[in-house]
């Protein structure tokens, strides 16, 4: 039987308030704090900060 993965599925939500989000994985051991990544928001049509949120 396969071992449970250390990588956790997360959701990166736009700080612009457009409702756009990306899904990705992150290693819980190496980065226990919340991620903040600058990515392109196609709704706002500019680069902005995306913050980590749990996938429901």
UniProtKB/Swiss-Prot annotation:
Signal peptide: none annotated. InterPro entries: Ribosomal_bL33, Ribosomal_bL33_CS, Ribosomal_bL33_sf, Ribosomal_zn-bd. One of its GO terms (cellular component) is cytosolic large ribosomal subunit. Keywords: Ribonucleoprotein, Ribosomal protein. GO terms for molecular function: structural constituent of ribosome. It comes from the Bacteria. GO terms for biological process: translation. Belongs to the bacterial ribosomal protein bL33 family. This is Large ribosomal subunit protein bL33. It comes from Dichelobacter nodosus (strain VCS1703A). The gene is rpmG.
